[in-house]
Amino acid sequence: MKKTIFLIGYMGSGKSVIGKKLSNSILYSFYDLDNFITTNEGITINEIFEQKKELYFRKIEREYLNELINKDEHKVISLGGGTPCYSDNMDLILNTSNSDSIYLNRSIDFLVERLYNKISSRPLIAHLKSKEELKEFISKHLFERNQYYLRSKIILNTNNLELHDVVEELKKLLG
């Protein structure tokens, strides 16, 4: 049976970068769910939110997640930050045969620094004007989302780890 590794975490937590490095290291296919959606839809996530709204996005996000899960190959899937929090996506993730879900836990301060210069390219935070507003938004959002993120099989605090160290730690945890 083919193995699936789900990377879960808040936007800016490094899921895509870590997923690429991990998949290369263990010779698995890598899929970034947001990139998979934009490739198949032919427009960016921002454009989907603007033109078709969030409800449409969450519907197709679930459909594309199912499509990736059903690919018959060993794979690492980097999820969108909100993916586990909508519909019964977290149940789907946890009930996927031969899978591991990994929450890449980052501090609020790390996320603020990482996201502040990318605000305009992130639909959920594009309206924020200052680091203080961003910090408050992330704090509230994480409080809401942690009930989903913390259901992951593996929780890895990545705050003080370099990329290479995160990948090595994940390989150890995955056996």
Tell me the role of every PLM-derived stretch.
Residues 35-94, 109, 121-123:
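ATP-dependent small-molecule kinase phosphotransfer cores
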Residues 7:
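Hydrophobic anchor at the beta1->P-loop junction of P-loop NTPases
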Residues 13:
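ATP-binding Walker
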